[in-house]
Structure formats: structure tokens, C-alpha cells
């Protein structure tokens, strides 16, 4: 019998057919890890497991080999209102660190490698790329608009593919979701699209590599930032990274303390102290910073210890033994150092095949747990896969406060053992740490279909026990603990991890099986060789190597009848991770190839035998001028092997894959043995390759790393202002000049003069260079990295081609005499910028041009001949130039020009002084003739207040040498002390990179002393009685 009422259980009905949420066994806990692509995955571990167990599971899940650069971060739960970001300590119990569930962690890069080229494994590079891109999107890696547009163009190239008009809207859509900053101009997407067109042909790995190489030059790259206040109660940000400690105020870097100068790090409650050695190497200065809380202060101190130990030491120091009474923190980083990581990679066996599928991160506008202080701890509780961002998201208004700086090359041959304590000072002792750039892998050959079994096999191996150790007791630490450390402090433990299902990956659905071509972003791959090229996709495996390509790029290459870019084979057993490439396909346009590290003469030696597996074949085509872009030295007639002595930036040799590097030994040229050839014969063979049987392609068989096993470390430009020794204020004014020159002589003898020079910034922080990078102005720059500051650039008023010229005003003031020497420092004119050059000379009323280069040097055009022959007239726009005098001596050429404006019929006279005795490479052996030339320039300046134009080829090297020499001469005549480093700093505040090399700086310092001691320059009578 039915009654008139009933019920319907909604909850029970919906639960029918659903898979119940699995709960971990009682003796296990579930940890949720969010990866850099915003996907999450659940890992189950034993309750009492150490952090290393979870780390190893994550590393094996992501198939990461170079593990030491990464870590897991979580939000610390405590009684304070402020949230704290902490790194998971591998050596401690996980539950004790995170207190209570949910155990939600985030996979992040912990140690940012200074040179992305050191990352051998592509999986590692991709994780770095995702991390740096995320930092950029979220405002934690500020840069100017030009740099942001360039980096964004590489992102689009890597994730969308080659630029096409029909996909231009896709590029704009991609950028709108990935880079959302309210301060960007409306035409930002168009600027990115213009740069995107220059990257046609770059495969994802090449675009990502270029992205990382440009990003690492940003000042806040790799910085772990903590808020604080300085002694003047100004809000500051303290960044800790691979190069040392940087201090920022309102987005501007105020100071930098390199690890080599730091003697001690300590903290007490909210006070963080840095003991820094002064330039004299004897005295020390204590820098005190106040941090927001005592806990954050301790985290900052720990971060400094970890960064210093990882990047500067060979092995971590031993943990001090516990005593009866312990005071101060005993924290020490016990993980593996970068040196150990590189050494292990060098001895690791070569890897086999591994399919690689990229995926786009989810939209960055969804803010995460770490986006602000108002976030509650509950917001970090996740039960399902979700979207999140990285910790510490600053306001987007800080984006344009930073400026992109070029990386300064610091040649370091030693690392320091740094003393850490909570209450005392300690001395830093040097340790030799040669870093080898060669790294390989030890994976067995397999395909993606066998990846789960591979993971299980790898997990059975010993897991390296790395992490941090801190005793419960607190005590200070003495420097001998690190200085006498000899053991690596690495322990082995066995990690037992369950096999991971092949259907679940951190990239979710984007990590598809090998048989499904993944072409959603303009790239397609497949595991088997295609029988034809109609699919616009090629196999990622060619002769046992990994290869990926853009379908569009392949089709275009095939249409031209040229080898497609994806057929560039990457041999994982080669020291270069590659065996052959075509330079014309390696890169296009901006950022074609990452710059290499400088190498010292000591690195050109090898004591170890080199096997046959280290022989690499490089293929390259000449540029449109018929040049390959490299020089060699040696030969049978010189009893020296043929070694690559120079590789020009942006040349074919620089862009080819693998890149040709300085120090490589050339064994064969187009199959011919060069061991018995003379130097001239070798050069002839290289030049003849342009018309050889290979269709103009040069084949070099080289032995890399033989003469440069110890690759030196790149560090970004230091804006810490070095302060060399100065004359004391108590010294009478009449003696300050002689005392300052004596200090200069002592610095030259000790070599400190070079150290001071290399510490000085190359480009002034905060000075923008946006005008020179506009599309209309790119062709007006002789070298793409030599650009004028926007604030001090010379602006043309009546030039048909626009107001831009690569030139800066440089004014050098002599305080006591009231003299201001005015210069216009510019690059050597190009053929199509000669008219602009003469317009500048006319508009600035210049009467003297100083030229410090010849037209060609070693067969290369250094400057266009922008003047007519003697008694001839040449038209440059509205200006008529006539050479009325041409006199040449052994060291100089003197010319006089008549310039007439056709519109106004006004005529002027301009003198050109060309110094031709400067050698093609290096500096003159004897400064005598150069001193005489500078004296003649000073005489030509007398009685004139108008600027003189000074140029060489780039307008920074020899140009800076002359400006410094003349300024020093004026200071000597005014009886003022001479500090060359201060002069260079003033010069670089007006034009970047003036005086380009340490050799040039040393030469001009020696010239100053030589001119003073010879009496060429001396104090004038009216100033000598001060």
C-alpha cells in the first residue's frame, strides 16, 4: 500500500558509482606536492620518514637527475600571524617540521645556477625555465619593458612555435594570460610579436636556453629576498644568491657583498650582521640590518649559509661536535655542493633516450597561498589537484623599477670557507675549487613506454642523503671547522618508493604517451622514424640522440631544400651534448646564442688524458660577409697545437650547435689532419672552405675541454662600489697627488688594481637603454650589446633617418681648476650611419674628431671610412664634406675637413686625429707614443668649450682609455690626487662599459705613472703651492 509521502536520498544517490577517496594506511601519511606547472600529485610515505624520502619520490617522479638544485617549500605553522616560507630539511622528520596535516608542499628551485649552460640534463633546464618564468610572471624577477618583451618572445617561441601571421592572435592571447601586469603599455604584445619573428627556427630547448641566459642577467635572478630596515631605518630588501648578498631599496640595488669579501654572518634576535673585509684586506666593516622578526632573521642567516656552502665550497663543513654547554645555533648545510654535483655528473655514464613533452603552466592570474600576508593558513589546504603560485609575490608596481644589467665576468679560481656564528667574527680562508663544466647522465637506453619501470629501477639505487643539519643546542662556530673540512659529509641511505603509474604525471594530460604527437603548441614529436616528411614532424631520436623541432620550421626548411632544424643531433655522450649543427638554423636575431664564460690561461691546461669519445664534429656556414667568426693560434711551425683563440659574439661559430669555444683544439679541417700544418696553412684551409666541396660549409673536428677543463664562473655586474685605498685626509694637499700615485703603483704591483676594476659595475644601475633597442634603431648599432643610455645619449635634431645615434655625452670635471672636458663618445660609423655622424658633428659644433682605430684590423672592418679622400668632396645628406689636408706619421694620421651646409651655405673646419699605432689585439707594449698622442689631443682642445668626438670601433674600449688618460693628466696639472677607479665610475655613469677590459685599464694606469715620472705631466705652478 502506497501512502501520499516519500523521500529521496540525494547524497546516497550521488555517491553511487563514485570512487571513494582513498585514505592512506594508518602507518602512512599523504603529502601533496604542487609542481611548477601548477599540477599536484599525492605521495604516501611512512609517518616517521625523513624529508629525504619525499624528496627522492618527487625527483624520481619528475625524472630529475641533477637533484641538488631543487627542494620542497612549505608554509610554516606557528603562533605568529605572519606566514613563513621554509625549505623542507631532508635530514629531519617530515611530521616534526610541518607539525600537522595537511602536508602540502611546493616543488621549487632552491639554488639558481649562475650559468644555464652548466645544466646538462634537459629535464633540469625545463624545470629552471618554468621556475624563472613563474618568477617573472609574478613580479618576483623585475625588469624593464624591453627586457620583459624579449623574455616574453622566447616564452612564446618555446610554447607556441614559430611566428605566423595567422597565429599572431594566439601569441597575443598567450601573453595576456601569462604576463599580466597593469603597468605594461598597450603595444606590449606588438613589441613581443616583433621580437617573436626574430626567433623563427628556434626549437623549444633553444628558446628556453636563450630565455634562461637573458634572465640570469637580471639583478634579482636567483635571489631569495627578505624584508628589513637598515641603520637609517629605511625599508630594504636583502637578497641572497650565488654571488653573495645584495641590498635593495625601493627596487634599486644599493649595495652588494660578494662571498669573497664576507668574513662572518651572524644574527641576534632581529639583528642580522655581515662582517665585510675592506679593500685593503686588513680592516673590516660590520653591516647591521634589522629584520621583521627573530624567526625570519634566523631563516635569512640559514639561507646565507646554504647558498655560500653550495656555491663556494668543495664539500660542506663537518657539523661541530656537541659539548656540555652549547650556545648559539649549530646549523650547517650538510647537503651536496655544486662542485660535488658537477663532479658526479662528469663521471656519470651517458644517458639513453627519454621522451620529453612540454606543457604550458596554468594561467598566472590565479593567486596562491603565498600571494600575500592576508592569506590564511587554511587556504593552503588542498585535497585535489589545483592551481597555485609561488611564495612571496610582491606588488606588480615594482616591475619597472629594475633595469636589465649585462653579466660581468668574474674569473674566480678559489672559493672561501666562510665562518657562520650567532655572536662572533671569523676569518674566511680560500679553498681551491675548479669547476668542471662537463656533465653526463647514467640512464639506460629506453623509451617513454618503459619509463615507470625505469623509475622503479632507479629507486632501488642508493639515494644521496643531502640536506641540512642543526643540533638542538645553540653554539657559536669557529672558522677552523670549515677551513679544515675534508670529508664531503655525504651519507647514503636506501629509499624505498612504490612504482608510479605511467598514467599519472606531474604535467597531467600534457605529458602524453610517446605515440601521440603533441602539436598543440606548434611542435609535434613521435617515437618512430617517419617514412616520409608529409607529417611536418620528425622523430625525436636520430642515431640514438634526442631531437625536437617545430613543425613550421621543418616545413620551411624543407621548402628551401635545406636540412630541417630538428635533425640537429644531440649526442648525450659528447662533452658538448651534440655532434653536429648548422649555424644558420641555430638561432635567428636577438639572443641567438648564450654568451660563454671567460676562461683564464690556467684553464687552458689539462693533466688528464682525453678519450676518443670527446672528439666533436662542428659544422658551420659563413655569414653573408664570408666570415666564420673565429680565430686560431698555433701550428706545426710554432710547435703548438692549433687552438681556437677567439670566437666573435653572434658569429657563425658562436651560433652553431655545439658552439665553438675558446680553448678548443682543432684536429681536422674538412677531414684533413692539421697536426703537421703551419699556422698560415691552417688559416688558408679555413678560408678555402667557403668555396670547397661542402658547398661553403666548414667541418671542424675538435677536442673540447682539453685546454679549458676549469671553466670559470660568471657573476652578474656588481653594483657594489669598490673603494680602493685612498690618501688620508691628514696628508697635506701638496703631498696627496704623489701619495695617490704611489698607492696606484702599489696596486699595480700587487694586482689589486685589476680586482677593483672587475668589481666595478659595467652599466650604471637605473640607467635605461630602451631607445637603442627600438626596431628602427637596431640596425644603427654596430654591436648589439653596446648601447647608449637614454638619459645621456646624443639626440639628432635634423637627421632624415631619425634622432638616434649610438653616442653619449661624457663630461669630466676637474674640480679645483673649474675645467670641464666635454666628450661625445660614440661607435665607429657604419656605412649607413655616416650621414648621422656628420649631422651630429655639425649640430654639436665639434671641431675635433679623435679616432682610435684603423678601418680594418686583421681583415675585419672596424669602422667605415666616413670621409672622402684628400681634395675630394663627398655628400652626406645636406652636408658637403671635403678633405683639404691628409698627413700621416708613424703613429698618427691628421686630416682636416671642410663641412658646408647646403641649406645655409655655412662652412666650418673640423680636424680629425687618428691613432694608428694601437695593435689589433691587446694594448701597446710601450705607452710612450700613446702619451704623446693624448698630449696632442689636449693641445687641440685648448681654447674650445665644445665637445670633441672620440670613437673607436664600439666606442667603449679605447675611447674610455683616452678619456681616462686625459682626465688624469688634468688632475695631475691641478695637483689633485688621481684615483683611476673613480674616473672610470664617473665615465660609466654616462656611457656604459667605458674601458672594456682589465688589460686596457692596467695599460692606462701604467701610462699615468709613466707620464708623471717622465715629467710629461706635472702640477702647474699656480696649483703646486696649494
Curated annotation (Swiss-Prot):
Q: List the disulfide bonds.
A: none
Residue ranges of domain PDZ in the record: 617-689
The record places domain FERM at 29-315
- Any idea what this protein is called? Tyrosine-protein phosphatase 1
Q: What is its EC number?
A: 3.1.3.48
- Where does this protein reside within or beyond the cell? Cytoplasm, Cytoskeleton
Reactions catalysed, as given in the entry: O-phospho-L-tyrosyl-[protein] + H2O = L-tyrosyl-[protein] + phosphate
Its EC top class is hydrolase
By its UniProt entry, which SMART domains does this protein fall under? B41, FA, FERM_C, PDZ, PTPc, PTPc_motif
Q: Where does substrate bind?
A: 920, 952-958, 996
Gene name for this UniProt entry: ptp-1
- Segments carrying the region annotation (Disordered) are 376-396, 430-456, 489-515, 584-616
Q: Which UniProt keywords apply?
A: Cytoplasm, Cytoskeleton, Hydrolase, Protein phosphatase
Q: Which InterPro entries match?
A: Band_41_domain, FA, FERM/acyl-CoA-bd_prot_sf, FERM_2, FERM_central, FERM_CS, FERM_domain, FERM_N
Question: Which classification does the entry list for the species?
Answer: Eukaryota, Metazoa, Ecdysozoa, Nematoda, Chromadorea
**Family affiliation:** Belongs to the protein-tyrosine phosphatase family. Non-receptor class subfamily.
Q: Which organism is it from?
A: Caenorhabditis elegans
Query: Could you state a single Gene Ontology molecular function term?
Result: protein tyrosine phosphatase activity
Q: Gene Ontology terms, cellular component aspect? A: cytoskeleton; sarcoplasmic reticulum
Query: Which intervals hold domain Tyrosine-protein phosphatase?
Result: 753-1011
Show the Gene3D superfamilies listed in the entry: 1.20.80.10, 2.30.42.10, Phosphatidylinositol 3-kinase Catalytic Subunit, Chain A, domain 1, Pleckstrin-homology domain (PH domain)/Phosphotyrosine-binding domain (PTB), Protein tyrosine phosphatase superfamily
| Superkingdom of origin | Eukaryota
What CDD domains does UniProt report for this protein, alphabetically?
Answer: FERM_B-lobe (cd14473), FERM_C_PTPN4_PTPN3_like (cd13189), FERM_F1_PTPN3_like (cd17100), PDZ_PTPN3-4-like (cd06706), PTPc-N3_4 (cd14541)
Pfam families recorded:
FA, FERM_C, FERM_M, FERM_N, PDZ, Y_phosphatase
